[in-house]
Amino acid sequence: MRFFIANFILRRNKNMMDYESFKQKVMEEFISYMPERYSDCTIELRKVPKVNACLTGVVIIPKGKPRSYCSPTFYMERMYEQYLECDSFEQVMQNQAVYLEESIKFLPEDILKLDFDSLKEKIVFQIVNTKENQEMIRHCPHREFMDLSVVYRVIVNVDEHGVSGFLITNDIARAEDLSEDFLYRLAKKNTKKIFPFKSERIEDTMKRMMKRWGVADKDIKASFAGVDEIPMRDRVYVVSNEYEFFGANALLYSDVLKKVVKSIGTDCYILPSSVHDLVILSTETFSESSKLRTLVRDTNCEHVRLSDRLSDNIYRFSIVDGSLECVTEEAS
């Protein structure tokens, strides 16, 4: 869709560069927009696998630094979108140069030097859809988990505005002698610490959303009158974490899921509403798994951004033995 829009704009303004011409001009001229101390730097393009996508990353390498040097990455595709919107190459370059310099100033020294002895406590999980992320998986340590894959990231910063960090690639893992099993053990400990999990009734999630949208308190209260009388077995829960980022990682923690399932009192279906949260409900109250799968698939297509989609499948958690399985198309 983006490139359809790009072609439409280009046809209306023949003076604008196409993507390939824009990319070449960035490679030739971007350094000239940076302060003088960056004049001896080189600029490199790297394919950067993102969740459900792959972007062209642009990195600046100072003279004498190894290629493993960790520079902030910006993306050619996103700069080109900005160029199409403002029709000014110079403006896009100036804005990006300011952003890059500010990012470098605030990067911790252990990140810049890729000092993994001090970064070990910042390594976390990220679960992604295996089928939709073949390019990412091919280039990084990972392990399969049902229809998903576990990859590893280093978290640079996390706050209410978002998460910044980078993917641990095969190149990084080899250079630092990091085995996948070692990464898994580190991430198992760190993820729960950096992103503390939380669970709440879906009504509480909806109340907070309505409050953000400016709905009056009395109207919110009226909308959920009587919800406390809903039997435990019929209640629906949302699992995420304190920052509401990558909350679906809870799938890797049986103890987190079991706590919610026990409060419901039956086996439960787990719906991956996005990479950031899970919805948990009783298999007895909501017995038709095919309808739940359709609900997840339709919600993904119509309401969830591509980068936030986890899976069109649903999962079943056993209250008896704590096992978790992917529910197949044929399950009913």
Regions flagged by a language model, labelled:
Residues 19-39, 207-248, 301-302:
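Terminal alpha-helical anchor/extension segments at protein ends
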Residues 46-238:
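Charged, alpha-helical interface segments at or near domain boundaries
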Residues 26-38, 93-96, 100, 187, ...:
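Hydrophobic, Leu/Ile/Phe/Ala-enriched alpha-helical segments that form helix-helix packing faces
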Residues 34, 38, 195-199, 268-269, ...:
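Residue-level signal for secondary-structure boundary elements
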Residues 2-52, 56-58:
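N-terminal alpha-helical "arm" segments
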Residues 242-332:
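C-terminal structured domains
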Residues 6-17, 76-82, 162-176, 241-246, ...:
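Charged, low-complexity surface segments at secondary-structure and domain boundaries
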